[in-house]
Structures are given as structure tokens and as C-alpha cells.
Amino acid sequence: DEYGNATKVGVADWQDLIYQDGFSQEYNISVSGGSRNGSWHSFSGNYLKQQGIIKESGFTRYSIRANMGRKIKSWLDMGVNISFSHTDTDFSRTNSNDYGVIRSALVFPTTYDPSDDETLNSDELSWLASNPYAYINSAKDNLKSNNVFTSSYLEIKLFPFLKFRQNLGINYTNRERGTYYGRRTSEGSEANNINGKAG
């Protein structure tokens, strides 16, 4: 108030507000078979989703694989393997020596009300730590990755004791990472003359 006395004091458990119970689920499916003419095949798929113990963090992956082969002659085999995987990772800002959501939750005063917009939008403690809520709600660090692998083989039986096998494989990986820090985080703070930061 006008006399310098606190008119509103919150009681914030910042660690409780940034942490959550981690949750993981995984599913697998596979099908395989063959025929009398010497051909065979197998197909499989996998889905994995992990929720991080810090809110807004997690990992998702799905993958598929196909293997096919055939005995062309009694002395000749050939086959092909194909796999594809996609991963999506949401990182939390925990690898900073000076700032980061974990350090901020440990040192940010508990007398601030996390439900008050003035707390979220305040710069007066930027020298100490960023508001933990700011890292949860306005900081993003996402990595998407795609991987394709194909291989084929040709195997020739030259003698009962000797085989020749040729393998050919191609591996392709694509990664895309994007980061954004809102202006209430140390990385994107107005104190650093930055109104948000993207990368």
C-alpha cells in the first residue's frame, strides 16, 4: 500500500507447481508369416509416450519395421529390411547453471502468489531467478526427428561350406529443433533487451 506494507501475500509451493507424476505407455504389434515357395515376411510397429516429471516435458516415438525375404533358388536368397521412426521431444529448461525451472523453483520466494498476474509479469526479481511459471508456460524447446533405414541383401551359396553375401543399406535422418523463451524468462527477458527469444 502507500505505506509500504504488503496488501497481498501468497504461499506458493513452486516445486509442487512445476513437478508432476511421470507417466509412460508403450504398445507393440507384430505380424509374421511365410509360404511354401520359400518367401517370408514380418511387420512390426511400436508406440511409446513418456510424460516428464516436469510439466510440459515429454517424449513420443512411433516406429514401423518391415522385413521380407525369399529363396529364389536352392542356392540363392534375397531380402529387404525397411524401418521408419519418428520422435518428438519436449525438453524442460534444466541444464542451466544460473537459471532454469528447477533452480527458479528452489530460490523464487514463496510469498509470491502464482495465481496473480503481477507475479508472472514482474521483473523485480529477474536478478535472482525467473518465475518458475514462466518456464513452464512460456518457454518451449522441441526436437522432432525422422529416421529411415533400408537395407537389402543377396546371398549365394557357392559351396556347402562357402557362401557369398552382399549387403546394401541407406540411412537417412532429419532433425528439426525449435526453441522459444518468453520475455519473463532469463533468456528472453527485457532486462537483456530482448522481448522474447526464438531459436
What is the predicted role of each segment?
Residues 1-11, 38, 52-59, 63-149, ...:
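Surface-exposed loop/interface segments of Gram-negative outer-membrane beta-barrel transport/assembly proteins
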Residues 2-30, 45-54:
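Short strand-turn segments of transmembrane beta-barrel domains in outer membranes
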Residues 19, 23, 140-146, 150, ...:
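Catalytic cores of large soluble enzymes that bind and process phosphate-bearing ligands
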Residues 24, 36-37, 73, 157-159:
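Outer-membrane beta-barrel channels and translocator barrels
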Residues 29-33, 64-70, 150-156:
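Residues on the lipid-exposed face of transmembrane beta-strands in outer-membrane beta-barrel proteins
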Residues 33-38, 47:
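A generic beta-sheet turn/junction motif
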Residues 162:
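An active-site-proximal structural segment forming one wall of the substrate-binding cleft
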